[in-house]
């Protein structure tokens, strides 16, 4: 399962981080049924494979009296769901269900102190998620047909203001916005 991480500091005010990872397994492994005085049957687990790719990157910066951050993330996978193993009927319930996932988001943050009396924090995020689940009786007679697709999008924005009247007296004013579909 390879993974690559690259981090770089461009200068005193800008740096980055990027990471990519790939995961794969066949999910085929031997297992044995046990009984009181030993092993009875050995089978091979099927449809337990997983394939996944994850990538993310970030930029980080400094501004006078503040900082900003930006990040992007992507994940894609496909996997099988292994079915039941029944000793009396080995291999009958093959269970060929599959699931596919896609996840993506981008987010950012900005914080700055404009004066000894006022500072600001802004945050934002957009996310997109997709899930596809398939159970097909043409591949596995023990299941009913299911072909589900789920889509979700989300946006989030936040602003926080801080006012400093005295060292012992501060006031905050914040607002959030969230939009979500499923």
Question: Predicted regions span which residues?
Answer:
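Membrane-embedded beta-strand positions in outer-membrane beta-barrel channels/transporters
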Residues: 3, 17, 54-56, 103-109, ...
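Transmembrane beta-barrel strands of outer-membrane/channel proteins
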Residues: 1-4, 18-24, 70-76, 122-128, ...
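Outer-membrane beta-barrel channels and translocator barrels
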Residues: 11-13, 23, 63-66, 113-117, ...
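Exposed, low-structure sequence patches enriched in small/polar residues
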Residues: 118, 123-125, 154, 162-182
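An exposure/low-complexity boundary signal
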Residues: 56-63, 67, 73-79, 177, ...
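Flexible loop and strand-edge segments within Gram-negative outer membrane beta-barrel domains
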Residues: 27-29, 42-52, 66-120, 124-153
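A general secondary-structure boundary signal
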Residues: 21, 61-67, 107-109, 154-156, ...
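Predominantly transmembrane beta-strands of Gram-negative outer membrane beta-barrel pores used
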Residues: 1-36, 42, 54-62, 69
């Amino acid at each position: 399962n390879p993974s690559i991480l690259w981090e770089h500091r461009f200068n005193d005010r800008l740096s980055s981080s990027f990471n990519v990872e790939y995961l794969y397994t066949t999910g085929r492994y031997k297992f044995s049924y046990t009984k009181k005085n030993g092993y009875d049957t050995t089978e091979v687990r099927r449809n337990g494979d997983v394939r996944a790719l994850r990538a993310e990157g970030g930029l980080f910066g400094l501004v006078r009296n503040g900082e900003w951050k930006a990040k992007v993330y992507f994940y894609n996978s496909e996997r099988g769901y292994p079915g039941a193993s029944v000793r009396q009927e080995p291999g009958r319930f093959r269970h060929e269900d599959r699931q596919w996932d896609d996840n993506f988001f981008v987010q950012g943050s900005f914080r700055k102190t404009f004066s000894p009396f006022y500072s600001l924090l802004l945050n934002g995020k957009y996310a997109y998620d997709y899930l596809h689940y398939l159970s097909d009786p043409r591949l596995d007679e023990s299941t009913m047909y299911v072909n589900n697709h789920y889509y979700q999008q989300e946006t989030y924005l936040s602003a926080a203001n801080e006012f400093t009247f005295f060292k012992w007296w501060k006031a905050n004013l914040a607002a959030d916005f969230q939009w979500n579909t499923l």
